[in-house]
């Protein structure tokens, strides 16, 4: 990954290796060997590439679908550096059930939690446009808690996400990958998660976890 978000255990590389032309085939073959009925394809940020990696991601998913025609596919995508042209190229004709991109944290904590090149608003832009150009695909995002946010900010963030047309949301407890990462601010009680679940369903999310 070319970014250095302060919550994430994935390593940061300033000069990543070249794309592997064999990756689409290897990915498709791995999914076939595992006998999966549903697969989530997760990617890293590749700000070094002109399209943020979109064309390679598309090649991977198309190969997976061709090799495994009965497998449901979900893409957990980067923000493609906010490049809507890359997003449109990626999603055109792509055999996806779910397009996911994570807002990660409430807007106030962007500068603390995420790489400077990422933001809540940019993530919303990606999610909103994905729904506009492919209304047949379910959109999904995730929000971490335990980073210093308030309960009110979580509710406000969910409202903004829903207004962007996002269909599904997950809320999860942040866990510190190492002492070099952000410390945990709190562990909300299960009752808090139940309250957020209710709020999300009232807002109209089709699935909440």
Predicted regions and their residues:
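Auxiliary Fe-S-binding modules of radical SAM enzymes
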Residues: 25-35, 59-71, 85, 89-95, ...
